[in-house]
Amino acid sequence: SSVEEALIEMYLAGVSVRRVEDITEALWGSRVSPSTISELNKKAYVNIENWRKRSLTGRYPYIYVDGVYLKRNWGGEYENVSILVAVGVAEDGYREVLGAQEGMKEDKASWQSFFKWLKSRGLEGVRLVVGDKCLGMLEAVGEVFPEAKYQRCIVHFYRNVFTVTPRGKMRDVTRMLKAIHAQETREAAREKAQAVVQKLREMRLKEAAKKVEDGIEETLTYYAFPSEHWLKIRTNNMLERLNREIRRRTRVVGTFPDGESALMLVCARLRHV
């Protein structure tokens, strides 16, 4: 019924169960019990799972990956659970949420499982994986997508350098980092990076210099692809915005009773993107 659909939509939109009860009482004069809401959610879960496990067709040269952390109840204790998310760009430029899967944490085993699951559903043609540098991702990409390259998000790279940069020198360092990725060729970017590392050492920012020196190469992969794609494939901003929306929607829930309910609510939002 339309009433049932409204209740499901309220919950999936991030409205708390208590708030749903209050709304139903205000609208219809009687409160809908938590058990009724739970039963309706089970119906919604079937539809969400069908979407989550759908077959993938076509080729996706670029995929963006990230993890969003939510709180869940684990044996009476509360801990974070990571929901791994992937968005693909097809050959015609169309963007699509490829899938989401629960990962206890962002490590090699979780990423490997996630990538293999995507491949089992038909994902192919991957040439570039864009994401933040996190434990095990690079190794998982190499094992599951051996023909693909890895692009470290330059925004996350900058933020990592900023963690060891004094506030008073932040503006200068930002300008220096952006100058690297403003170059027209990878070779020119490497030369600029060397100059930036030297300048940072002269500024007595040895830790920042080391982070740039150690991590810059992973941020330059995009130069191997068409220049008209560079601005889009060198950052994970698209998925970052999506994850912020997920966090906003799930914040009202607080702690999820289990990983399954967290995954369901995340996918309910993703399938309408």
Residue ranges and their predicted role:
Residues K42, G58, G93-E96, A109-K116, ...:
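Conserved phosphate-chemistry cores used by DNA topoisomerases
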Residues L27-V130, L135, E139, E143-E147, ...:
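RNase H-like nuclease fold core
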Residues R18-G29:
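DNA-recognition alpha helix
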Residues E4, V17, P34, S38, ...:
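Amphipathic alpha-helical transducer elements in NTP-driven molecular machines
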Residues L12, A182-V273:
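Acidic/histidine-rich catalytic cores and adjacent linkers
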Residues L128-L135, A140-M176:
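Conserved beta-strand -> loop -> alpha-helix junction used to position metal-binding or nucleic-acid-contacting
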Residues S2-G14:
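Short, amphipathic alpha-helical "recognition" segments used to contact nucleic acids or chromatin
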Residues G103, D172-M176, I180, E184, ...:
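A short, charged helix-loop
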